[in-house]
Amino acid sequence: MGAVYLQSGVCLLPKTDDHVRRLKMIENDIVEMTGESVILETIALDRGQEEKVVARFRADRDEEYRELLDKCSDFDTEIERETAARHFTYAELEENDVDLKKLQSWFEKIRKLDFYGAPLAAEAAERLRECEARLEGYAQQVFDAHDENR
């Protein structure tokens, strides 16, 4: 859900209809298991406190974007390796296409939880576009290699 965890089971989320609905369902599950749950709406005491919370949300998302950026680098390395080996097969193209779709899906999941615009969001989006372009280039090489063999 993208919450910031404070301590002892206390977490913060921006109030959205989706969060309220999901939290109510979670609360119901907890109560059915004879547990306790309290959902509160809070307001920061001042702008400084609010900025601390927003900074935590951004830091959490940046950590996820950093992981994604690392995986984008791995994706690029794989395409470079296949290109250097002149391994232009449809099977390899399909495998790389699946990997790119996983990266795209992961990015969308992070973006959906990026409530306050983490600093690395733009870099991650650009990096993903570069991966898409790299795969397009590799795909063209696969097509060309297969056309030459006909």
Residue ranges and their predicted role:
Residues 1-80, 105, 112, 131:
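Positively charged, polar, low-complexity stretches
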Residues 18, 43-46, 50, 57, ...:
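Solvent-exposed, non-transmembrane amphipathic alpha-helical segments
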Residues 34, 41, 76-83, 87, ...:
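Long, hydrophobic, amphipathic alpha-helical segments used as structural scaffolds
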Residues 63, 67-70, 91, 98, ...:
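Alpha-helix boundary/N-cap detector
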Residues 71, 75-78, 82-86, 90-93, ...:
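Cap/lid and interdomain-hinge subdomains that line or gate substrate/regulatory clefts
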Residues 101-150:
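Glycine-rich, aromatic-bearing surface loops/beta-hairpins
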